[in-house]
């Protein structure tokens, strides 16, 4: 019914504005096929394969990281039936869905613990650790990514209080140290993936910030946006 109304209304508007009799007749005669095509689109999948000719391998608008055919076939076999997603087959009892990847991620990265979410990792981290407290972040790293996601907005939504420090082009480790107070819940660093500040610049390395955090017993949160555990430089990628 919606398709009938939409296509009919579109035809009425065209007839009211156009003086092209031939086109009016053509559109009137094709009204029923147009309605059928519009209705068919409602039940057709929207996602379609495309060719990435942008030069950007991990394209945020084109699906980001790809899954190999081998792993895609394995996933198809899993998601098209029942699985042990939250069931411990050895114990014969309820399990944790995170157990399938946590140990592997810890082994690969050397982390003490690991968690995976499908989105909003930074906001979830800030909300869990920093709600109501202060989080210093460099003024030169207050990024905005596609979709109008801004660091200040994410901080506010999480309940954390953002403390911007340094200047647009230079931030020193001492800026972070001076910003620490009794209300500080974490130190933050954001990867500027979609722009660069060049020239008379200075920034704090993740290692230096982590050392400061350890010395003050304050967690350090680094928002990488995306990353890779394998060095792709030999392949000409950066």
Annotate the PLM regions.
Residues 1-40:
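Long amphipathic alpha-helical segments
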Residues 34-36, 59, 90:
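Catalytic, metal-anchored helix/loop core of enzyme active sites in primary metabolism
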Residues 57-61, 88, 136-138:
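Short glycine-rich or small-residue beta-strand-to-loop segments that form or flank ligand, phosphate
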Residues 44, 92-238:
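Conserved PLP-enzyme active-site core in the AAT-like
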Residues 52, 61, 84, 118-120, ...:
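Asparagine-centered polar/low-complexity signal
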């Amino acid at each position: 019914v919606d398709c009938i109304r939409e296509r009919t209304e579109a035809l009425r508007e065209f007839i009211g504005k156009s003086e092209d009799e031939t086109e009016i007749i053509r559109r009137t005669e094709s009204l029923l096929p147009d309605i059928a095509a519009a209705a068919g689109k409602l039940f057709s999948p929207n996602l379609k394969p495309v060719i990435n000719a942008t030069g950007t391998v991990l394209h945020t608008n084109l699906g980001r990281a790809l899954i190999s055919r081998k792993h895609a076939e394995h996933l198809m076999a899993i998601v098209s039936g029942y699985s042990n997603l939250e069931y411990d087959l050895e114990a014969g009892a309820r399990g944790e869905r995170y157990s399938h990847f946590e140990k592997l991620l810890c082994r690969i990265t050397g982390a003490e613990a690991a968690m995976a979410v499908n989105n909003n990792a930074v906001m979830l981290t800030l909300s869990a650790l920093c709600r109501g407290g202060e989080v210093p972040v460099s003024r030169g790293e207050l990024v905005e990514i596609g979709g109008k996601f801004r660091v200040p907005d994410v901080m506010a939504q999480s309940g954390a209080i953002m403390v911007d420090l340094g200047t647009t082009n230079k931030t020193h480790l001492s800026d972070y140290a001076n910003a620490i107070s009794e209300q500080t819940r974490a130190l933050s660093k954001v990867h500027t993936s979609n722009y660069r500040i060049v020239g008379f610049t200075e920034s704090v390395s993740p290692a230096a910030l982590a050392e400061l955090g350890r010395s003050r017993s304050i967690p350090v949160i680094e928002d990488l946006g995306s990353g890779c555990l394998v060095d792709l430089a030999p392949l000409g990628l950066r």
